[in-house]
Amino acid sequence: MNVKIDGRRKINSNVIVPPDKSISHRSIMIGSLANGVTEIENFLFSDDCLATINCFKNLSTDIEIRNDKIIVKGNGFALSAPKQILDCQNSGTTTRLLLGILSTQEFESILTGDSSLKKRPMKRVTVPLSQMGAEFEFLEKEDFLPIKVKGSKKLKPIEYTLPIPSAQVKSALIFASLKAEGKSVIKESPKSRDHTELMLKHAGANIKSWEKDGVYTVEILPSQISSIKIKIPSDISSAAFFIVLALICEGSSVVIENCILNPTRTGIIDVLKQMGAEIKIEDVENRNGELVGKIVARSSNLRGVKVEKNDIPRIIDEIPILAVAAAFAEGKTIIDHASELRVKESDRIKTTVEMLKSFGAECYELENGLEIIGSREKLKSAVVNSYKDHRIAMAASIMACAVEGESTILDADCVSISFPNFYDILFSSTKKI
Ligand SMILES: O=C(O)C1=C[C@@H](OP(=O)(O)O)[C@@H](O)[C@H](O)C1
Ligand SMILES: C=C(OP(=O)(O)O)C(=O)O
């Protein structure tokens, strides 16, 4: 599906942003491993999260959708051998976290995914999980899906420092450590998103975590998990598109309520504020360890910024939309130390640069990042390739709203990976200036 957007639009409304993708995946996984019935409210029914549900159904977890809630009947880590190949579709989170969980199971399973996921590296999880005693076989190409995994009931605990901060790698190791024979210690610097730790603590697992001298440590003891009730907040990674829309379109403002404000996720707010964005955070509350609150943003004169290396993990999924904001800012923006972008759904350094250039922006690819020279006056409508990457499609759509003329976003249906009603909300909440 291609989407046409008639530009020079503005927004002046409340937007109901979809539920958080990271927390939605984890709610199904932790619910499946818990003893008892987990109730999930406000689950994200997007392609990635549906892939997680299907994998766990295939592992015999009883998952039922009842009046907008999801009911997961957990069997305390007693999963059953899948009858089919586990298809993780486009979802890196599903794959890597599942590899950690399946390391605790004695049966054999095969995981695969779509053509994009089959290009994403998996040794980052299989190497440490093998040290714990799980067995992996790459069935086509070393480091990539499809993978055969055979776990063990006698996993060794691990002491491991992540070479690159990653919530997916950390979470895979935490899940495996819950069933290891002793205490595991995982370290990373700087800290990546900690939803797994927070949700497992809430479910009674024996986990401690702390930060000291810039190093984040998680200590895990063998644990049982209790069932929980979860109400999932809105996803700040999805909210980011509407925040930037309000910032770059004249006479605009947006209000997003009930949004996740976990400090490992709010890098986009901090960097946009450094760029001069008028953003306010209000009504913050703590919901079982997760901060949730309201975001208000309005049109602002932005200036370029150099993004700090330590902020990269806190902003990793928001870099395509941050780059759009940078194209409307005055001066240069430098985003470096972001080599991880090369192994997302697309090579997001290349695809973000291509997308911005189609609109006439001045921007350059760096080895591990990108440089954007703000040039609001030069920007024009475009026909843009999304490279079937949801975050590129949405970032391009926001850019298309702000420039003059009609733009076309190619293969825009990929937004269903994380934000299925993105275009309904975009067209109903904006109007031509
Ligand atoms: O754990 C998660 O839910 C995620 C972790 C991040 O990936 P990495 O762990 O590879 O950095 C992020 O890019 C992804 O969208 C979601
Ligand atoms: C990278 C992403 O997700 P995943 O790694 O789960 O595919 C994303 O949503 O931008």
UniProtKB/Swiss-Prot annotation:
Q: What is its EC number?
A: 2.5.1.19
Q: In which pathway does it act?
A: Metabolic intermediate biosynthesis; chorismate biosynthesis; chorismate from D-erythrose 4-phosphate and phosphoenolpyruvate: step 6/7
Q: Which GO terms describe its molecular function?
A: 3-phosphoshikimate 1-carboxyvinyltransferase activity
Q: Which InterPro entries match?
A: Enolpyruvate_Tfrase_dom, Enolpyruvate_Tfrase_sf, EPSP_synthase, EPSP_synthase_CS, RNA3'P_cycl/enolpyr_Trfase_a/b
What does UniProt list as catalytic? 317
Q: Where in the cell is it found?
A: Cytoplasm
Which reactions does this protein catalyse? 3-phosphoshikimate + phosphoenolpyruvate = 5-O-(1-carboxyvinyl)-3-phosphoshikimate + phosphate
A Pfam family cross-referenced in the UniProt record is EPSP_synthase
Q: Just give the chief location class.
A: cytoplasm
Q: Where does 3-phosphoshikimate bind?
A: 21-22, 26, 166, 168, 317, 344
Q: Which GO terms describe its cellular component?
A: cytoplasm
What assembly does the database describe for this protein?
Monomer.
Q: Which family does it belong to?
A: Belongs to the EPSP synthase family.
For this entry, the protein name equals: 3-phosphoshikimate 1-carboxyvinyltransferase
Q: What is the source species? A: Caldicellulosiruptor bescii (strain ATCC BAA-1888 / DSM 6725 / KCTC 15123 / Z-1320)
| Gene assigned in the entry | aroA
